[in-house]
Curated annotation (Swiss-Prot):
Keywords noted in UniProt: Acetylation, Cytoplasm, Protease inhibitor, Thiol protease inhibitor
Gene3D superfamilies named among the record's database cross-references: 3.10.450.10
Gene Ontology terms for molecular function: cysteine-type endopeptidase inhibitor activity; endopeptidase inhibitor activity; protease binding
Protein name, as recorded: Cystatin-B
Source organism (scientific name): Rattus norvegicus (Rat)
Location relative to the cell: Cytoplasm
Chain positions of motif Secondary area of contact: 46-50
Site (Reactive site): 4
Modified positions (N-acetylmethionine) in chain numbering: 1
Alphabetical GO biological process terms: adult locomotory behavior; amyloid fibril formation; negative regulation of proteolysis
Signal peptide start and end residues: none
Family: Belongs to the cystatin family.
Biological role: This is an intracellular thiol proteinase inhibitor.
Amino acid sequence: MMCGAPSATMPATTETQEIADKVKSQLEEKANQKFDVFKAISFRRQVVAGTNFFIKVDVGEEKCVHLRVFEPLPHENKPLTLSSYQTDKEKHDELTYF
C-alpha cells in the first residue's frame, strides 16, 4: 500500500470490529442516536501520520454508517478518534474517502 493512498476495500476483520466498537460511544454521542446492531462489514485503510480506517458498519434495518477512525502512531500513546461519519448509508453504497 502506498503511503497516503487508501487501500482497496476489504472484508472486516476482528480488529476492524474492535476499532468500530471502541468509537461506537463517540458516534452515538455525535449522531445523538443509539445503535443496538453495530457490525463491521468492510474497511479501507489509509496510512498517513498514523492510520485512517474507513469502516462500513451495519446498524440494522438495512442501514449502514460509514466511519472514519484515526489511529495515531504508537509512540504518541493516544486513543482512537472518530474523525468523521456518514449516516443513512446502505450496504451497496461504496466506501470512499470522506
